[in-house]
Curated annotation (Swiss-Prot):
Gene behind this protein: Pgam5
Role description: Displays phosphatase activity for serine/threonine residues, and dephosphorylates and activates Pk92B kinase. Has apparently no phosphoglycerate mutase activity.
First-level EC class: hydrolase
Record-stated family: Belongs to the phosphoglycerate mutase family. BPG-dependent PGAM subfamily.
Localization, UniProt: Mitochondrion outer membrane
GO cellular component, as recorded: mitochondrial outer membrane
Protein name in the entry: Serine/threonine-protein phosphatase Pgam5, mitochondrial
BP GO annotations: positive regulation of mitochondrial fission; positive regulation of mitochondrial fusion; protein dephosphorylation; response to anesthetic; response to heat
Keywords assigned: Hydrolase, Membrane, Mitochondrion, Mitochondrion outer membrane
Catalytic activity: O-phospho-L-seryl-[protein] + H2O = L-seryl-[protein] + phosphate; O-phospho-L-threonyl-[protein] + H2O = L-threonyl-[protein] + phosphate
GO terms, molecular function: kinase binding; phosphoprotein phosphatase activity; protein serine/threonine kinase activator activity; protein serine/threonine phosphatase activity
PANTHER family assigned: PHOSPHOGLYCERATE MUTASE-RELATED, SERINE_THREONINE-PROTEIN PHOSPHATASE PGAM5, MITOCHONDRIAL
Source superkingdom: Eukaryota
Length: 289
């Protein structure tokens, strides 16, 4: 009986301490609704159906009245504004490169970086994709990666779109911040608006007249790709630096006709041998493969 009383008292004291802690620090509470409720806890968890400003209801003139003729007009225009097919956007990070000198002209791929790009090109060829569009950043390392990939897939080099908006940069101050990388606020302002403009240029649901699924290949940079992933999935964009992707890795996002976005690959590099898996700039130039 004495043991039972001791157990009950101890348990009660534990619950009391837990309850008092909850009152003092409500942010530390674990919400059961995170796991068993269909109602999101935080507003940002709600999906914005008009994220690309192409939601049919946002493009069509609203109903003016409830007359059958007006409803028929509205429904016809609504149907005409709807996308019919999905868009697939495949993002490839450039291969490993040498960060030698201040000019981008000196930032060429290493031997290992070229091998990485070759493996990526072979992988894309194996997927048997018929590319509708290929876009590459204008930075040297992305251009060289794109050129190597083009040797493996069926696409005319003259049709590649070179886009300065895709150049590497600082998209948005990351959370949590890191001590080893602290660009000036002016750089975030300059790069962030450019990278966001690139996102809006390439990420949107299909146009209504698109009759088949489309495939766009974008050869770019780690920061830009990670920011794109967060924006496309409507995750907090400040979390982009929590993601790590390897050199020449493949990230695949699909935008459905409804505007919903899903991710198929994130930084996939499993098709490369282990010795080619890298994600940082080599510091010792002499030891570069």
């Amino acid at each position: 009986m004495r043991k039972l009383t001791s157990f009950v008292c101890g348990t009660g004291a534990g619950f009391a301490a837990y309850y008092l802690q909850r009152l003092r620090d409500p942010q530390a509470a674990v919400h059961n609704s995170w796991t068993n409720s269909d109602k999101p806890v935080d507003p940002w968890a709600l999906w914005d159906t008009n994220w690309d400003c192409r939601e049919p209801r946002a493009l069509v003139r609203p109903l003016r009245n409830s007359q059958p003729e007006e409803e028929n007009r509205y429904n016809a225009e609504l149907e005409k504004a709807k996308a019919k097919k999905a868009r697939h956007i495949i993002l490839v990070r450039h291969g490993e490169y040498l960060d030698v000198g201040d000019s981008d002209d000196t930032h060429h791929l290493t031997d290992r970086g070229r091998k990485q790009a070759e493996f990526t090109g072979k992988r894309l060829s194996e997927l048997g994709i018929k590319w509708d569009k290929i876009v590459a950043s204008t930075m040297v390392r992305a251009q060289e990666t794109s050129d190597i990939i083009l040797k493996q897939i069926e696409f005319e080099k003259e049709k590649v779109v070179n886009c300065a908006f895709l150049r590497e940069g600082a998209p948005i101050p990351p959370q949590p911040p890191v001590g080893h990388w602290k660009p000036e606020a002016s750089q975030f302002l300059r790069d962030g608006s450019r990278i966001e403009a690139a996102f809006r240029r390439y990420f949107h649901r299909a146009y209504p007249d698109q009759e088949k699924e489309s495939y766009t290949l974008i050869v770019g940079h780690g920061n830009v790709i990670r920011y794109f992933v967060c924006r496309a999935l409507q995750f907090p964009a400040e979390g982009w630096l929590r993601i790590s992707i390897n050199h020449a890795s493949i990230t695949w996002l699909t935008i459905s006709p409804s505007g919903n976005v899903s991710i198929k690959y994130l930084g996939d590099s499993g098709f490369m041998p282990p010795e080619l898996l890298t994600n940082r700039i080599p510091r010792d130039v002499k030891n570069v493969v």
